Structure formats: structure tokens, C-alpha cells
Amino acid sequence: MNLAFIPSPSTGVIELGPIPLRGYAFCIIIGVFVAVWFGNKRWVARGGKAGTVADVAVWAVPFGLVGGRLYHVITDYQLYFSDGEDWVDAFKIWEGGLGIWGAIAFGAVGAWIACRRRGIPLPAWADALAPGIAIAQAIGRWGNWFNQELYGKPTDLPWALEISEGPNRVAGTYHPTFLYESLWCIGVALLVIWADRRFKLGHGRAFALYVAGYCAGRGWIEYMRVDEAHHILGLRLNVWTAIVVFILAVVYIVISAKIRPGREEIVEPDRDATPAEKDGSGEDGSGEKGVAKADAAAKDPLTKDEPGKDATAENAGAAGAAEKA
């Protein structure tokens, strides 16, 4: 055995004391918590209320899990509905099998419902969460390592992944596509954070950049995989999906930048207001002083930008005058 190879785990179950937890589920749970935690920090830094990201996630996550599983079952229906297969296995989500495309689409529906209930803009919420989702995917991909699934073509490279003999798999060393995608997602998260700082992305453009960045990587990584998949014109279905979604994301970024340049100012209806905001005091009688102080108190934990920094010159001047008073 080459010690440079990446070994596969002997079991896909993590023992948490008396509680057995499948590694796949564990990675997803950790990823969700990291995404919500980091998204909350970005949301608060932009003027939102702490806890809002988690409240919306309560809707988005279940919708996302259902959508991700549906996409997987529909696109790989032969695994569950062919002769000799048990259709009940389609409900065993803990054994692996989530399609990111369905998860994002259905998760967006759940988030939209929650955002409407809270009276906040969905694009702004998505922008705050975007890099956290990429990090969550980077963590979640390690669930494939636990399950010894979705690996690439055979290779003898030093970082090859050792796969043991098992149902529907042949022992050998393969490209660790789970690791490639995990590292790619970390890169996408850093790209979104940098671009958000550099270009003040708003109105859903940070989220669209995450989608485009992920699709660019998923296309070539998907091409390396050897698991069974449907093909269209010689390409795997997920490669075509990545191409189409990538184009849509880029088009959205371009059109959105022309129609709604800059970044929206996030103020939640139920956000804790300062006394100046509540009674409308301030130099211009509209509570600008209270808003300016609240915005100045919150800065993006990574970009160090003030949430109201890209407001109009008129508002900036009014806030400055109020501060001097």
C-alpha cells in the first residue's frame, strides 16, 4: 500500500457516545450550522437583525433537503425504481444522494416564503449567506468520503483515494473528486468575499457569483466522475445543468448590475430601533442620526465595510451633519 494515498474510512458511522451518526449526515449538519453562523455575521454587519438568518434557514433547509433528494431520485431513478430495486430506498436520505441543483432551487422557495413573512428582501439575504453556502458545501462533500461514493477515474497519483471492495464499487485508487470539489468551494467562498468587498455586490449578485463559480468547477469535476449517470450528447446530465445554470447566473449579474447598481441598504421592519429612530428625531427630522449610528456600529467581519457606505451622497451628507451635531 502506498502511504501517500488517501485512505477511505473503515465505516461510514461516527459514534457520538451511545448515539450512532452517519458521517454523511454529520457533514451536512456541520455545514448548515457553519453557513447560518457565518451568514448571520454578514447579515448583521449589513444592518440586519441577529437571528434573522437562522429564522429564514428554518424554512430554507427543509425545503432544500427535499429538493436535493427529489433531484437525485428523479435523475437517478434507475437506482430506486428498476427491477430488483426497492423504491423505499428513495427515502433513505442518510445513505447519501442529494442534488445541489434541487437543494438550491427548493431552498430558495423556502427562503422566499420566510423572507416575505419577515418583510425582508430575499436577494439581500441570499447575498449575506452566499459564501457560507459554499463553505457548507465544502464540508458536506466529505460525506461522500465517508460513503466511499462519487469518486473519479482510476489514478495512481500520490493523492489518489483508496476505495475498498463493496456493493457497486471495485477496489482501487481513484481521483478524490470529493476533495477537488471541497477545495473548489473554499475558493468560491473566498472569491465571493473578495468580490463583495471590492465591488459592493448587492441585489443578489454575490449569490449569483457563488452559483456561477460553483458551476464552473462542478462542470470539470463532474466530467471526471465514474458513477452511473444519464448522458445527453455525450455529456453527463449534471455537466449540462452546470453549463445552463452558469450562463443564467452570469446573465443575472450583468443585467442586475445595470438595472440596480450598488448595494441595497438593509433595514428590517422589526429591527431594534434607537430612540432617535423611534421618535423621528435628528437634524432632518427623519431619524437619520439614529440610522447613521446604527450603521456605523456594524461592519462586515471580513470586509470591514460599513453597511450604509454605498448610500447616496445626499444621505451621507445628512448623516455626517447629524454626527457633528
Curated annotation (Swiss-Prot):
Pfam families: LGT. Belongs to the Lgt family. The keyword Membrane applies. InterPro entries: Lgt. Residues 266-325 are annotated as: Disordered. It comes from Streptomyces griseus subsp. griseus (strain JCM 4626 / CBS 651.72 / NBRC 13350 / KCC S-0626 / ISP 5235). This is Phosphatidylglycerol--prolipoprotein diacylglyceryl transferase. Pathway: Protein modification; lipoprotein biosynthesis (diacylglyceryl transfer). It comes from the Bacteria. It is found in: Cell membrane. One of its GO terms (biological process) is lipoprotein biosynthetic process.
